[in-house]
Amino acid sequence: HLQGFATSNHYGATADGLVMAYRIGAKLRDVDSFQYHPTGVAHPPHLAGALISEAVRSAGTKLVNGLGERFVDELQPRDVVAAAILRECREGRGVVRDGQVGVFLDTPRLIANDPDVLNRLVTLGHVAHKCGIDPAVEPVMIHPTLHYQNGGIEINGDSATCVEGLYCAGEVTGGIHGRNRLMGNALLDIISFG
């Protein structure tokens, strides 16, 4: 939990691969760059960090603060949306429940405008059920969640590191997507590196 943020990662994700590679001389890059997924569950506390997909925002769900105001274009890059949510909370326009702070994903309005949307966004229904809410009646409280380390082991186009015989691919590598990856990075990794 970097800087107190909930995380979508399991507690066993401790960067052991990066440490091992670094100790034998591999170069690391951008290890100070982390991505915060904008729509992680904030309430109830035992689900903090569970992710709600971008598909929910791309379907038309709006983010609203504690005053009921929309405050960001939800389809902006993750870092822009996450920063806007943090600003609303920091400036006192967030929502507080059981000590958790966040904003609302306005699911009631989405479902009222498109009653069949939950048939397409099945995971939204599952997450709402776990939260103990009916998303057609009550909005989901969300907050940015620590999701991904953008940095990692530096590789070339053949997946080779600067250490002879050490090849790396996948989430242990850094720099392929820059400092602010988009969703679906695993697809690019598989297509590019097999």
Regions inferred by a protein language model and the residue ranges of each:
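Short FAD-binding loop at a beta-strand-to-alpha-helix junction that anchors the flavin cofactor
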Residues: 1, 158-182
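A conserved FAD-binding loop/helix module that cradles the flavin
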Residues: 2-24, 175-194
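Generic recognition of stable, solvent-exposed alpha-helical segments in well-folded globular domains
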Residues: 13-16, 80, 116-126, 145-148, ...
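An anion/pyrophosphate-binding glycine-rich loop and adjacent beta-alpha core
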Residues: 20, 26-138, 186
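Histidine-centered active-site/metal-ligand motif
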Residues: 35-37, 143, 147-148, 177
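Short secondary-structure transition/capping segments
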Residues: 40-45, 148-149, 180
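FAD/FMN-dependent oxidoreductases across multiple families
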Residues: 55, 126-164
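Short, ordered coil/turn segments that flank beta-strands lining enzyme active or ligand-binding pockets
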Residues: 66-67, 157, 192
